[in-house]
Regions:
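Core beta-strand elements of the Rossmann-like FAD/NAD(P) dinucleotide-binding domain
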Residues: 5-7, 151-161
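FAD/FMN-dependent oxidoreductases across multiple families
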Residues: 70, 241-306, 326, 331, ...
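Active-site-adjacent segment of FAD-dependent monooxygenases/related oxidoreductases
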Residues: 43-46, 50-121
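Residue-level detector of alpha-helix initiation sites
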Residues: 15-16, 41, 167
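Conserved FAD-binding catalytic core of PHBH/FMO-like flavoproteins
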Residues: 69, 85, 118, 161, ...
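Helical substrate-recognition/capping region of FAD-dependent monooxygenase/halogenase enzymes
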Residues: 2-8, 12, 28, 81-84, ...
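A conserved short coil-to-beta-strand element within the FAD-binding core of flavoproteins
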Residues: 129-143
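N-terminal Rossmann-like FAD-binding beta1-loop-alpha1 element of flavoenzymes
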Residues: 7-34
Length: 523
């Protein structure tokens, strides 16, 4: 048996969620060990949609630009029915003014994993590949994990906390005995990555709508390269592993009703769609994140992005507790915030999926006749864009009802405690450029520089290590984003969600917030 490894956090699983958590812990200066049963990052494309909120998180890691360069922006949506184009609408700037990344990026899971793994390697960290979790136990003081390497050597990892990022069949979840309730869509889905030759330019996410269902062609990096996704009919009786590629190709051609040639298939698979969430994201000193905690329909490409946000939410809380800057009760808010988000996500994706794939005659009529006719007009309206983009891109996720959101002073603002910090520019640059440090951010907005003197209350004293204080000009964009033209202060959590907001220069609100949440230096 090898020597015992001692660390702060043991992460089980090195998919997008586990790697994201590891990267965030690097930012926060927290020790960790990642164990992964596979030999390296996935070679398969798997998930492909990367949304604005994920790119904003990547930006803090210095990875956003490279992600965009490696992927393909979905410039528009093309709607087909009966083999003919029924409508088109632009997607290239659908979220303009709402995020630095106002689009949907097509970037395969394999490339996301390589990006994140590259970040770890560049910071001198690695993953224990070919290492499987065999069992674990926990006490009030910590967690002990027993793992086995590819050569059969057993090893012990002792940590303060364990996080299961080990997928939909999560051994960690099973060992914790946590229920994973939900439902299964009975029809079988298919997916293939291939070259598609047809009359259309490689510039759009193309959706072919039919009476029974749909076929979607997602443009990927590379000439005429697409991800093709669709559904077999209800009477299709084969098990997932028995389906031949030729059956998928025949189905695509039958549903699309257009002349096309599919070749150079890189990967294909079939699967059933499940919608489930765990009863709790936490049990003692163990946590679940990503597919280990929630799975849902592929509608809206939410899965990988949601797991990355799970990791982002948990990392800063673990860091504060492990460094002695907050009580362990802070970790309870991970389950509070992310379980509620998972429930909302499942409801939303289920509705989207039912509209896209439901066989009922009314849905069929709407899918093939009504939606293609009105979609272009609807998505030309700013009001629709400002509703749909935050919903799909995940920038609209909020924690307004959580215990970390203090609403005493936010009544007069458009932005509420629990909301993501809105995007706008300050002196020509993204406000997010000022918020990259892994700290709380106390921002004073004023039309007279220096009028809001936050340091007077001791932020540069007892909270000096935890809070970054800045005074920013109250520009037109800032005033519009927050809905006020008078001086105000906003305290952002380390994940850039609003904890507290108040008018004027009073220090009482945000200082009381930090007093409740943190343990100031010297206490």
């Amino acid at each position: 048996m090898g020597a015992t490894i001692k660390t702060d956090v043991v992460i089980v699983g090195a998919g997008p969620t586990g790697l994201s958590l590891a990267c965030q812990l690097v930012r926060h200066g927290v020790g960790f060990v990642v164990v992964e049963k596979n030999e390296g990052v996935t070679p398969y494309s798997k998930a492909i949609g990367v949304h604005a909120r994920t790119l904003e998180i990547y930006e803090q890691l210095g990875l956003a630009r490279e992600a965009v360069e490696r992927g393909t922006v979905a410039g528009k949506v093309r709607l087909l029915s009966g083999g003919e184009v029924r409508g088109e609408f632009d997607l290239s700037e659908v979220g303009e003014g709402l995020s630095p990344y106002p689009y949907v990026l097509m970037l395969e899971q394999s490339k996301n994993e390589r990006l994140l793994y590259g970040y770890l390697k560049s910071h001198g960290r690695d993953v224990l590949w070919n290492t499987a979790l065999e069992s674990f136990s926990q006490t009030e003081e910590g967690v002990t994990a027993f793992v086995k390497t590819a050569d059969g050597e057993s090893q012990t990892v002792e940590a303060r906390y364990l996080v299961g990022c080990d997928g939909a069949k999560s051994p960690v979840r099973h060992a914790l005995g946590l229920a994973f309730e939900g439902s299964t869509f009975e029809r079988t889905f298919y997916v293939a990555d291939a070259q598609v030759d047809w009359r259309f330019a490689h510039d759009a996410l193309t959706v072919s709508l039919s009476k029974e269902t749909f076929v979607v062609f997602f443009p990927l990096k590379g000439e005429r390269r697409y991800r093709v996704v669709g559904v077999f009919p209800e009477e299709f009786a084969k098990d997932e592993g028995e389906v031949l590629y030729e059956e998928i190709e025949a189905r695509v051609k039958a549903e699309a009703e257009i002349d096309l040639d599919i070749h150079d298939v890189e990967w294909f698979s079939t699967y059933k769609v499940h919608t489930r969430h765990v009863e709790s994201f936490a049990a003692g000193r163990c946590f679940l994140a990503g597919d280990a905690a929630h799975i849902h329909s592929p509608a809206g490409a939410q899965g990988m992005n949601t797991g990355i946000q799970d990791a982002y939410n948990l990392a800063w809380k673990l860091a504060l507790v492990l460094k002695g800057s907050a009580a362990e009760g802070l970790l309870d808010t991970y389950n509070e915030e992310r379980l509620e988000n998972a429930k909302n996500l499942l409801r939303t994706t289920d509705r989207m999926f039912q509209l896209a794939a439901g066989p009922e005659w009314l849905l069929s009529f709407v899918r093939t006749n009504v939606f293609p006719a009105v979609a272009g007009y609807l998505f030309s309206l700013d009001s629709v864009k400002r509703f749909v983009f935050p919903l799909v891109s995940q920038i609209g996720i909020n924690y307004r009802h959580g215990s970390l959101s203090r609403h005493e002073g936010d009544g007069d603002f458009k932005v509420k405690a629990g909301d993501r910090m809105p995007y706008f520019k300050v002196e020509g640059e993204s406000v997010y450029d000022r918020l990259r440090g892994p700290k709380f951010h106390l921002l004073g907005f004023t039309d007279e520089r220096g009028a809001v003197r936050m340091s007077d209350a001791g932020a540069e004293g007892k909270y000096a290590d935890l809070v970054d204080c800045q005074t920013l000009p109250l520009s037109g964009q800032a005033a519009e984003a927050f809905g006020t033209d008078g001086p105000f202060q906003v305290l952002l959590r380390p994940d850039n969600y609003v904890g507290h907001i108040s008018a004027g220069a009073s220090t009482g609100g945000w200082e009381a917030y930090l007093d409740d949440l943190c343990r100031p230096s010297g206490r």
